[in-house]
């Protein structure tokens, strides 16, 4: 039986694993975290995607013969070269996602009560630590500021409400028309009472005497000419700073791929954003037998795009192995 392995048990990796298993391959999925599912399990809130549904899909793959190795950080525990050499795998699909959060680099980001959206959503989804007997509580305050305007920001804001926050703000440097989140996500957030503080940007997070967040200072913005993304560039209004009392700040400013795989795989081409470079839609990389897809090549995107990439790559991997 021909063997292939998958790095990452998120939507791209799970889709590729299922398609390869159907084609008769022995597939092993290596997952860095202790539960398979990736963003489906850790990132998307329970009220949007029940975890029992994700587990059903994973259990279905196991019945098809797919093996899952969790707590396996490829690039640290094992490398791609080792797996394709000593372990005898003929091809790999890299679906390791883009889980490295970005921060603003402003004063106060290291205070207690400041989270990345990734950490906040992971904690709120799991509500426990790696060891079943240990808890990793999430401290949600009464007043929460979520910085950013994408779908993940909406998820974080709505999760904070469900965890008991009295007031939740979305702080975004452009206007409502420029919000990158889907229209439906914005409407849901508005319906639930989340307050949108648009055309303003944080400049500092202020501490109390114990090192916890007590407030956030923002500056008003105005929109200038369009930038490279086609959206109008936000420009600071001098002297317009104001302070909001908050006790939790969640940074939802996008993510990038973890550098572990690219730094331990010689000859694997990446771009300036750290994303793996591929040819066409099939996910073929600069390394023979190495395919990639999902957020690992695009940066943070949608689940459906990641699944499509996994499907296309599985087909390409099959063609590659059959023609070897």
Q: Where do the model's predicted regions map?
A:
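FAD-binding core/adjacent interface of flavoenzyme oxidoreductases
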Residues: 1-7, 23, 51-54, 66-143, ...
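FAD-site-proximal beta/loop scaffold in flavoenzymes
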Residues: 110-141, 226-300
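Active-site loop ensemble at the mouth of alpha/beta enzyme cores that anchors a bound cofactor
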Residues: 108, 200, 214-222, 238
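Glycine-rich beta-alpha junction loops
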Residues: 97-100, 174-176, 220-222, 257
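Beta1-alpha1 glycine-rich phosphate/pyrophosphate-binding loop at the start
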Residues: 5-74, 102-109, 119, 153-205, ...
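Long hydrophobic segments that form regular secondary structure
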Residues: 138-174, 242-248, 255, 274, ...
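A conserved FAD-binding loop/helix module that cradles the flavin
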Residues: 296-324
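A conserved short coil-to-beta-strand element within the FAD-binding core of flavoproteins
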Residues: 70-84, 199-211, 221-224
């Amino acid at each position: 039986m021909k063997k292939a392995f998958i790095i990452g048990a998120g939507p791209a990796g799970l889709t590729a694993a299922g398609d390869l298993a159907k084609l008769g391959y022995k597939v092993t999925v290596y997952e860095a975290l202790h539960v398979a599912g990736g963003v489906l399990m850790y990132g998307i809130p329970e009220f949007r995607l029940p975890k029992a549904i994700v587990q059903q899909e994973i259990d279905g793959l196991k019945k098809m013969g797919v093996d899952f190795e969790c707590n396996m950080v490829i690039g640290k525990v094992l490398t791609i070269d080792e797996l394709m050499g000593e372990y005898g795998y003929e091809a790999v699909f890299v679906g390791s996602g883009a889980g490295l959060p970005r921060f603003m680099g402003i004063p106060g980001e290291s205070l207690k009560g400041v989270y990345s959206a990734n950490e906040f959503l992971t904690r709120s989804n799991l509500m426990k630590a790696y060891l079943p007997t240990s808890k990793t509580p999430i401290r949600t305050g009464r007043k929460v500021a979520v910085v950013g305007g994408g779908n993940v920001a909406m998820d974080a804001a709505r999760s904070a409400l469900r965890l008991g926050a009295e007031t939740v703000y979305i702080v975004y440097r452009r206007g409502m028309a420029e919000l990158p989140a889907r229209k439906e996500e914005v409407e849901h957030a508005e319906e639930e009472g989340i307050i949108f503080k648009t055309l303003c940007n944080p400049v500092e997070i202020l501490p109390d005497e114990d090192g916890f967040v007590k407030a956030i200072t923002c500056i008003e913005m105005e929109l200038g000419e369009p930038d490279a993304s086609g959206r109008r560039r936000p420009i600071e209004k001098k002297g317009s700073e104001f302070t909001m009392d908050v006790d939790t700040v969640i940074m939802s400013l996008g993510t990038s791929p973890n550098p572990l795989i690219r730094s331990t795989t010689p000859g694997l081409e990446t771009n300036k954003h750290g994303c793996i470079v591929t040819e066409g839609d099939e996910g073929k990389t600069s390394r023979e037998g190495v395919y990639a897809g999902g957020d690992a090549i695009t940066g943070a995107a949608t689940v459906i795009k990641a699944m499509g990439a996994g499907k296309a790559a599985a087909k390409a991997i099959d063609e590659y192995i059959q023609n070897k």
